[in-house]
Amino acid sequence: MLRFVCIVFLSTVFVVKADKPNIILILTDDQSWVGASFLADPKDPRSKSDFYKTPNMKRLAESGMRMTHGYAPAPFCSPTRKSILTGLTPAKHEYQKDRENWTKAFRKQLTIPKILKMADPSYVTAHFGKWDARYDNFTPEEMGYDYSDGLTSN
């Protein structure tokens, strides 16, 4: 009985409400694995450049989480960005190549900002930069973002 009480006590002692994390996802288009002045993969000395000077990227990489094994699900940028936003492959989110009326299904998909708000409604989300909406002009706000720089038409 004493062992049970100790286990229950210890399990409740360490239950502390953690603050929600700040999440900043920076995605660069056509970023080379060796296009920065720091090791993209600390285990591989070939994963940096002595030519490029990227002190701000280096500082971010040193103080944040670094993803070293990312693979594009498509050979061009739009379906890749939409896969990151939804966690789905292009075959599942239905954007594979420019075509009209593809956004009908896409607008219904869960996205990172929508999921964050489901977990905690006080999350504030924003999107700045490339927003490719060649057809149907769906907006970042429709995908769950609170703030954006709008349709950038690229």
Q: What name fits each language-model region?
A:
Residues 4-14:
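Sec-dependent N-terminal signal peptides
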